[in-house]
């Protein structure tokens, strides 16, 4: 690929994640985007367990059974001359670690909000990570087909709770059973809800921004209310500011209904136009790697075992940051200095795959992994070793002791634990004295998924013994004395052999600090 071709290819890319609180409609809008991208012909409903239809992005059996996303899926398609990479993230709060890591691999985020509920806790958490990264955030106020809160109230709440300017790009004309359409502020037209002519769902507006000609909607109170609201936000609202959007200080707000596929196409067309192409990535050496740099580089943000249960494979997901990835490329793994040839690579449509021959900045490539990679690894072709910024790691809050139910199946038990831990699906610790396995998780559902996958993917039933909620704190190995351990502060080591204590409660932690003031206790995120 010539430098000009590389630049053109990079400028076509739009790589983003969809974030939301559970049940705000994230998976439904993902499906509708795939529908417009020609990837699927019919949108499934993630809740439709009885109908046997499942969301394309929910490919793991447990996701289909429970109607939730527990892993990040990657989907790619072309639309309006752009190459779209969607990273669908787990909506369930117990899987925030996977979601946070995914947000490190995107150039923008789409925040889906239930217009009946407004800003919810998980939305707030994920928004903070996007804000911290300074990436553009686009808002889709969903479920307009149901009665919800007033649009002005929703925007006011968003601005107050998330500390970001909101800029409405369209405006609802009614909602629920009174939903008539969307006033497209940017394009000066009205998109009708359930129009008589589906091929042309738009109403033209006159120079004053009102419906041209005769139309019964003119006399409808929801239309006049919408005009009043639009006049108000025109005078007192925030002006559209691309510079503020680029830095994550302003969010364009679109209203619609993913379930009825209303307003989604308008959103997609605006998004591909407004969202950024891949930009420079910061390294730990505090240098910037430009996407058009001729040397290939990328980082691994996710590892997934058993995407194809028939082959028991393991895929490392790489975000390409610069240069061109080609099949058979020779790269260096920065962490070990090891050189390797990447012959087996793939691109995704959830669990469906195709061999990838070429990829550029913004693309997500799957590498078949035999155990070489870890989450956070950097690979590159340049002479100078580089390491991209570290991915966030979290302090677990819940812990369980885990053992194999059948002692004759120790091999599959150990393999399953090793692979699921390397995925980042759960955290693993060993006790110093007995080498018992202790699992750490952010939420209870992680344990359930771990237990399910051990049984169904590794044929290893496990016994999970709760040791309760504990406070995990790491210490300097040089300060460690095993006599510090007790039943109230369990001494364990992580997968990097770093020592830490699992304190029974805050009181136990304070008691320890008073007794050993010279020992510094640290937490992850």
UniProtKB/Swiss-Prot annotation:
Binding positions for GTP per the UniProt entry: 20-27, 88-92, 142-145
Residue span, tr-type G domain: 11-279
Q: What is this protein called?
A: Peptide chain release factor 3
> What function is annotated for this protein?
Increases the formation of ribosomal termination complexes and stimulates activities of RF-1 and RF-2. It binds guanine nucleotides and has strong preference for UGA stop codons. It may interact directly with the ribosome. The stimulation of RF-1 and RF-2 is significantly reduced by GTP and GDP, but not by GMP.
Cellular location(s): Cytoplasm
Q: Which family does it belong to?
A: Belongs to the TRAFAC class translation factor GTPase superfamily. Classic translation factor GTPase family. PrfC subfamily.
State the UniProt keywords alphabetically.
Cytoplasm, GTP-binding, Nucleotide-binding, Protein biosynthesis
Cite the source lineage.
Bacteria, Bacillati, Bacillota, Bacilli, Lactobacillales
Q: Which gene encodes it?
A: prfC
| Pfam name, any one | GTP_EFTU
User: What biological-process GO terms show up in the record?
Assistant: regulation of translational termination
The family database entries (HAMAP family) matched by this protein are listed as:
Rel_fac_3
- The reply on keyword GTP-binding is yes
* CDD domains per UniProt: RF3, RF3_III
The answer to keyword Manganese applying to this record is: no
**GO MF annotations, alphabetized:** GTP binding; GTPase activity; translation release factor activity, codon nonspecific; translation release factor activity, codon specific
């Amino acid at each position: 690929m010539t430098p000009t071709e590389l630049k053109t290819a990079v400028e076509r890319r739009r790589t983003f994640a969809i974030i939301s609180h559970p049940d705000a409609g994230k998976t439904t809008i993902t499906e509708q985007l795939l529908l417009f991208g020609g990837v699927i012909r019919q949108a499934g409903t993630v809740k439709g367990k009885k109908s046997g239809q499942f969301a394309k992005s929910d490919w793991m059996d447990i996701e289909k059974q429970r109607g939730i996303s527990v892993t990040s899926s990657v989907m790619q398609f072309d639309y309006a001359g752009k190459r779209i990479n969607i990273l669908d993230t787990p909506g369930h709060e117990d899987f925030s670690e996977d979601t946070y890591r995914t947000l490190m691999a995107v150039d923008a985020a789409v925040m889906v909000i239930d217009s009946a509920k407004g800003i919810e806790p998980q939305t707030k958490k994920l928004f903070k990570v996007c804000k911290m990264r300074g990436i553009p955030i686009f808002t889709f106020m969903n479920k307009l087909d149901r009665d919800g809160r007033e649009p002005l109230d929703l925007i006011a709440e968003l601005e107050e709770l998330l500390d970001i300017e909101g800029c409405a790009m369209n405006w609802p004309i009614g909602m629920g059973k009174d939903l008539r359409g969307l006033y497209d502020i940017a394009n000066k037209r009205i998109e009708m809800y359930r129009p008589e002519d589906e091929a042309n769902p738009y109403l033209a507006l006159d120079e004053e921004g009102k419906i041209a000609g005769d139309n019964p909607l003119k006399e409808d109170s929801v239309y006049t209310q919408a005009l009043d609201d639009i006049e108000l936000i025109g005078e007192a609202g925030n002006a559209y500011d691309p510079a503020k959007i680029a830095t994550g200080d302003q969010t364009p707000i679109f209203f619609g209904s993913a379930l009825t596929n209303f307003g989604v196409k308008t959103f997609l067309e605006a998004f591909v136009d407004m969202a950024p192409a891949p930009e420079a990535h910061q390294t730990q050496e505090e240098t910037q790697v430009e996407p058009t740099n001729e040397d290939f580089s990328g980082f691994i943000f996710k590892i997934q075992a058993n995407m194809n249960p028939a082959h028991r494979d393991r895929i490392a997901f790489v975000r390409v940051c610069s240069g061109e990835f080609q099949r058979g490329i020779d790269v260096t793994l920065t962490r070990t200095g090891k050189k390797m040839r990447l012959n087996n690579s793939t691109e995704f449509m959830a669990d469906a795959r195709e061999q990838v021959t070429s990829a550029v900045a913004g693309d997500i490539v799957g590498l078949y992994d035999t155990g070489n990679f870890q989450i956070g690894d950097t690979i590159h072709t340049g002479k100078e070793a580089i390491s991209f910024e570290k991915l966030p790691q979290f302090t677990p809050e819940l812990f369980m002791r885990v053992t194999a139910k059948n002692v004759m199946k120790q091999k599959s038990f150990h393999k399953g634990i090793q692979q699921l831990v390397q995925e980042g699906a759960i955290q693993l610790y060993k006790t110093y004295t007995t080498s018992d396995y202790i699992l750490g998780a952010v939420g209870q559902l992680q344990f359930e998924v771990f237990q399910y996958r051990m049984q169904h993917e590794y044929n290893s039933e496990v016994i999970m013994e709760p040791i309760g909620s504990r406070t995990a704190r790491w210490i300097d190995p040089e300060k460690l004395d095993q006599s510090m351990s007790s039943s109230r502060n369990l001494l364990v080591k992580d997968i990097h052999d770093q020592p830490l204590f699992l304190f029974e409660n805050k009181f136990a932690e304070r008691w320890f600090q008073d007794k050993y003031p010279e020992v510094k206790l640290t937490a992850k995120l």
